UniProtKB/Swiss-Prot annotation:
Organism whose genome encodes this protein: Salmonella typhi
Cystine pairings recorded for this chain: none
Protein's name in the database: Multidrug resistance protein MdtG
Cellular component, GO, one term: plasma membrane
GO terms, molecular function: transmembrane transporter activity
Coiled-coil zones: none
Length: 404
């Protein structure tokens, strides 16, 4: 048994990586509420220009993350996951600090791209835990870990808005850099990893990685599932506030209502992910995945017919509970169908598909709503998720038949 296969106090590592994912999720979302305001402060004027630059600085991070993730995953498989976590936390802290000092929009755009290049904390945290936790507890552990990033992402916008109101926009970037540096310190002092470095010659090439997979087709279908999950989530984001305003009519607290409806899926996922992950360890993550996808379809369709914001909020809460099972189930199936030797790359490829979904989802939602209205977005998204449910079921059925 190689050192990388020996679990070393994985429960402590799970706790520390959960805190790291929480801080990373919070740090990323701290600046999200006022990105357009900061773009404006950097000299961009005019409605069209502001919209264009805001979209660019938002999406470029995901684009560069999608490009860089496989490289960092390969390096993690060679050098170990802890060193990549340290590199990511420290690199992002420095970039966030520099963002607070940006003097023009081009500097800010380049720094947002650099943030994507240097990211990768959460996928490598997943890879670290996946290679250390006992296989029969993978679903629970990865489900629990996923709640760290979700919790941070929920808290971040609220904290970022309050900090920006009290201290201004630039100081929030400095505070965010401090949060990421704390993440670096936690990782440095408390995460333990037994890893035997692998020389570049001994590293498996992409073809060998594919050949080493137990079921390459299934792994590809899991990557596609990750992409579609993010497309489905992101397609609703651009139109949610406008749809809520259409449902609520002329009310004074539309921002509060929209914010609440935007956050309820995250709260539900936070509650459901560990429980459904544990259930997946008992009955199989493939069953959890297919059932959660079908439930998502059944909840998305009625969203296009709701008459009040509270009906939408209830459906989104239930959708969040189902969604809380999806990514952990995908990650658990990736663990089952790969080896520790290639875990970093497999999780990084999965992250690349997730980043592509983060970019294409909002574009799809905006295009559909512009052509056919808000309600059509939910129906089209339901169709995309239904396709994914059928595709995933077929891939899992083929694997089962091959085993039999």
């Amino acid at each position: 048994m190689s050192p990388s296969d020996v679990p070393i106090n994985w429960k402590r590592n799970l706790t520390v990586t959960w805190l790291g994912c929480f801080l990373t999720g919070a740090a990323f979302s701290l600046v999200m509420p006022f990105l357009p305001l900061y773009v404006e402060q950097l000299g961009v004027t005019g409605h069209s220009a502001l919209n264009m630059w805001s979209g660019l600085v938002f999406s470029i991070t995901f684009l560069f993350s999608a490009i860089a993730s496989p490289f960092w995953g390969g390096l993690a498989d060679r050098k170990g996951r802890k060193i990549i976590l340290l590199r990511s936390a420290l690199g992002m802290a420095i970039v966030m600090l520099l963002m607070g000092m940006a003097q023009n929009i081009w500097q800010f755009l380049i720094l947002r791209a650099l943030l994507g290049l240097l990211g990768g904390f959460i996928p490598n945290a997943n890879a670290l835990i996946a290679t250390q936790v006992p296989r029969h507890k993978s679903g629970w552990a990865l489900g629990t870990l996923s709640t760290g990033g979700v919790s941070g992402a929920l808290l971040g916008p609220l904290a970022g808005g309050l900090l920006a109101d009290h201290y201004g926009l630039r100081p929030v970037f400095f505070i965010t850099a401090s949060v990421l540096f704390i993440c670096f310190l936690l990782t440095f002092f408390f995460i333990r990893e037994n890893f035997l470095p692998v020389s570049k010659k001994e590293m498996l090439h992409v073809r060998e990685v594919v050949a080493s997979l137990k079921n390459p087709r299934l792994v590809l279908s899991l990557f596609v599932t990750t992409l579609i999950i993010q497309v489905a989530t992101g397609s609703i984001a651009p139109i949610l506030t406008l749809y809520v305003r259409e449902l609520a009519g002329n009310v004074s607290n539309i921002a509060f209502i929209s914010g609440m409806i935007a956050s309820v899926p995250g709260v539900a996922a936070l509650l459901s992910a560990p429980r459904l992950g544990k259930l997946g360890d008992r009955i199989g993550p493939e069953k959890i995945l297919i059932v959660a996808l079908i439930i998502s379809v059944l909840l998305l369709i009625p969203m296009s017919f709701v008459q009040t914001p509270w009906q939408l909020a209830l459906l989104r809460f239930l959708l969040g509970a189902a969604d809380g099972a999806l990514l952990p189930a995908v990650q658990t199936l990736l663990v089952y169908n790969s080896t520790n030797q290639i875990a970093g790359r497999i999780f990084s490829y999965n992250q690349s598909f997730r980043d592509i979904g983060n970019v294409t989802g909002p574009l799809m939602g905006a295009a559909i709503s512009a052509s056919y209205g808000f309600r059509a977005v939910f129906c089209v998204t339901a169709g995309v998720v239904l396709f994914n449910a059928i595709y995933s079921w077929n891939s899992l059925r083929r694997r089962r038949l091959a085993i039999e």
